[in-house]
Structures are given as C-alpha cells and as structure tokens.
C-alpha cells in the first residue's frame, strides 16, 4: 500500500477519492517503465498507453505527491526561461517552434479535462501578468511584437485596464493571455492516473526506483521491492530523482516556493480582485494568485533553495498579500504549504533520449503544468520513432547543478534577482515622487 496521506493543503482537503495503488513486488515486464507520478510521468504514461504501449509507472510516495499536487494551478504556454532570452540564444524560428510545443501542452491538458467529463477541474480562464514598474510608452508595441514573433495570442493591457480588474496601486501595465486557464491540479493528476489504468497502464505507489542496469537491448529498473524489465525507461522524477541516476539527479536543482489559501473572505475579495482568471506579476521571484471557492484567495510566491518549511509561513504569506492589497488586511490564512520545483541551471526543461532507450522528461521549474504535457508529447513521439520534437530541447543539456555547492551558488543568484526586483521598484517609486513634486 502507498505510504502516508497527502501533505495538508487546500487541494488535499478538496481532492477526489482515489484508490491506494499497490507497491511493485517481484519482477515484471513492460514496453516502457516510467519513474515519477507527477505530471511529467503521468502525461508520458497516458500518451504512450493511448498508443497501445504496455506502461508501468512507479511513484515513491503517492500520485502527484510532489509539485504536481501542490502548485498554483496555472496552465499556460511558454517556459521558465524568458522568451526574449530564448530568441537571443536560439533565434526566432527555433524559439517559435519551442513556444508552439508549449501550446501543444496547453491543448493536451484542455482536451484531457474535456475527455474526462470533469469541467469542475477547470476553475477559470485567462491570465494577467502585471508589471510592478511602469513599462513606458512603448510597452504595447514591444508586447505585440513579441507575441507576433512567437506566434502567441497574448496582448498588452494599459495600467488603467489592469487596475480596472485589480484594485491595487502596485500594478502598472499587464499582459493578457486569453489561452491560459487554471485548474485543480491534484484532481487533474488523479483523473490522469485513473485514465492510464483504464487504458491498461499499471501504477505503483510507495515504490522507489533505486537502480538502473542495461540488460542486452532492454533496461532493468530496480525498485524498493521489485524490478521492471522494459525497452524504454523515462525518468520523470524532477528534483527528487535520487540514486536511480546520480548524474541526472544532480543536474536538477530543488527550489522551494509556497502557496497559501485564505479562509473565506466575503465581498471584500470581489471588490479588490474583479477577475476570475489567474494573476501573476513580472518579477523574477513574483507573486501568483487566483480566486478559488468563490471568495478564497489562493496565493503563491517566494523562491528559495532552502527546502525546509519556514516556521512563520502563514504570516509571511499574509504579509505578501496585504502588501499588494492593503484593503485585505483582515484576512486569515486557512492553509499554507511548501512545494519543490526542479530547475536546471538554464531554466529550460530537460527532454530527450540520453542513452539508447533511456529518456528524461524533467526540470520544468515554475512552468510545468502545460510544459510537462509538451515534454511528454515529445518523449512519446521519440519513443515511437519521431525524434523531431525532442530535438527542439537538445540545446538544453543535463549539465551539473552542483549538489550542495551549486545550491549555495543558486541561492546567491536568487538573492541577486530579488535585489534587482527591489531596485526596479525603488527607481519607479523615486520617479513617481519626482513627478508629484
Ligand atoms: C508551490 C508550487 C507552485 C507552482 N505553480 C505552478 C503553476 O501555477 N503553473 C505551472 O505551470 N507550474 C507551477 N509549478 C511548477 C509545476 O508544479 C511543476 O513544474 C510540475 O508539477 C513538475 O512536474 P514533475 O512531474 O516534473 O515533478 P513532480 O510533480 O515533483 O513529480 C515528480 C514525482 O516523481 C517521484 N519520484 C522522484 N524520484 C523517484 C524515484 N526514484 N522513484 C519513484 N518516484 C520518484 C516524486 O515522488 C514525485 O511525486 C509550481 C510548483 C510549485 C512547487
């Protein structure tokens, strides 16, 4: 039986009932073995099972026990690495094809929710990304140009349009994406798992993959109490992959971020946030939030490489909310929880075949809900003989993220990013002051 319950969260409190899946005991055979029961592993297993492949998935804890069951729930195109940087590095054509692959991921998620007949999993449509600094007169032109270059459908909103929806002086212009939406991620993961089983796939919880050996033209994946012999193995364990593949596990950096859900707020919330879509800001370590359950605020934010839970997490999150919406000063936090994202140093996912029959689908950072589906689609196509989608990701290797030393270095980088957010805002406040006097 699977170990433990889900960690306490609003998602766990509102989740669907799901069976405990048995541990893998003894040796079994499959076409494909998947390590990790988060969205990367679940989408991969489902897409392959849809193609008639015999799939076995092993998960150390429970389905979507990691980031996939605890995140902000935003589904949208793009990647954790900024599009402008991708264009500089790869050129326009390649960046456009990468963006298109992320749009494929969005569609896979949308179509799966439709196919499951679960409209309640889809909790709202559209997204606003608001700037905390004035972006100047050319913001609209720059935004439209970037959208055109990428083949994207996002569009600029002025400061007045933004503040009409979000009653805070913190925000200036924003980017409106009509193609994004937001979901109940844990229930979506549980629905994916049920669908894999309907398609004949086998899921094992409480089962850690511990070692991997070549056996002729197949792989032997050893687990805590058993083993799988398979032609292909897909490693989708993100930042907690562990000893099953030491090099790949070191190539993904664990970065913590936090989510809180308030108690029910009443009409004050609707007065402050007149928008049922998702919201985030443009900072490197920004806030992301949405209204759930009618009048609760689900608020995510902060990043750190310290993966332990801070003792005063609820107060920290409440302070973050009130700093943007001072009119909500009386709110109370009902749930707060941490989650671990997996980042590669280049901030792009690691997707592809690293040895014959050994695949990776990992390192989705803070942009994983659609991108895991995009990655799974690329890996599935690769396993079935078309490597072109996986090749899109080949410039982003599985370089070393550095273990404890790399983590300290990454923490310094994050502090620098947060400092530059702070300087941007300070400069903005000084400019505003100058205009007033
Ligand atoms: C708090 C938070 C908020 C976020 N908000 C958003 C958001 O709003 N939108 C968005 O797009 N992204 C968001 N993200 C990122 C997104 O959740 C992740 O990118 C995505 O869920 C990653 O999926 P995954 O399957 O790669 O990893 P995970 O969900 O972490 O799954 C990996 C699984 O593999 C298992 N595993 C690892 N190693 C082994 C092993 N050796 N044997 C067996 N099992 C193993 C783990 O137990 C785990 O369950 C957020 C992340 C967090 C933490």
Describe the role of every protein-language-model region.
Residues 307-309, 314-430:
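C-terminal catalytic lobe of FAD-dependent flavoproteins
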Residues 1-32:
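Extreme N-terminal leader/targeting segments of oxidoreductases
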Residues 30-57:
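N-terminal Rossmann-like FAD-binding beta1-loop-alpha1 element of flavoenzymes
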Residues 138, 145, 172-231:
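Helical element adjacent to the flavin cofactor pocket in flavoenzyme catalytic cores
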Residues 78-160:
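Dinucleotide-binding Rossmann-like beta1-alpha1 core, especially the glycine-rich loop
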Residues 92, 119-129, 161-195, 199, ...:
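Helix-loop-beta segment of a Rossmann-like dinucleotide-binding subdomain
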Residues 50-70:
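Glycine-rich FAD pyrophosphate-binding loop
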Residues 107, 115-123, 209-211, 227-267, ...:
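Active-site substrate-recognition segment that forms the wall
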